[in-house]
Amino acid sequence: MGFQTTDVKLIQALSAVQQFVPMYGLPDHLMIHVEYHSDAAMSWRRENDELFLRCSGVGQALMLLGRALTLHDRSAESLIPRLDQLGAMLDVSRNSVYTLPTMKKFLCQLALMGYTECYLYMEDTYELPGYPYFGYRRGRYSVQEQKELDDFAASVQHS
């Protein structure tokens, strides 16, 4: 699936998403046109191999793209968001620490569903410099891995 757009921020977010979320059964080429505005209403319209998005930011553009690619019974939709933020919290404590690729894939899926935030409940599953036995013998995220996840989340529009 080849996406094309002139929006630099959307290109960056889409390249991150496409690394982890495969897009099947779609046309070989899809040109995405984005019109940003400040009011709450947002919409998408598909005409042949072109997709027209109207939204207030890249996060909403990803969500509209996700809807446009999965709602095969319609060619257009208008939405008024009821929430400014939508978040999920994952419990990664008690030896249920996801690998980085799994977390990145999950963040991409959340972005395509319109989520703006993701929190990790970690208890002692993170590295604490100077305390080598903190979370001893448990899966945990190093400081570098936490930074990598945070940077990736920002690239797909999670705060």
Predicted regions and their residues:
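Acidic, contiguous N-terminal accessory segments
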Residues: 1-77
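Feature activates predominantly on carbohydrate-active enzymes
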Residues: 19, 47-159
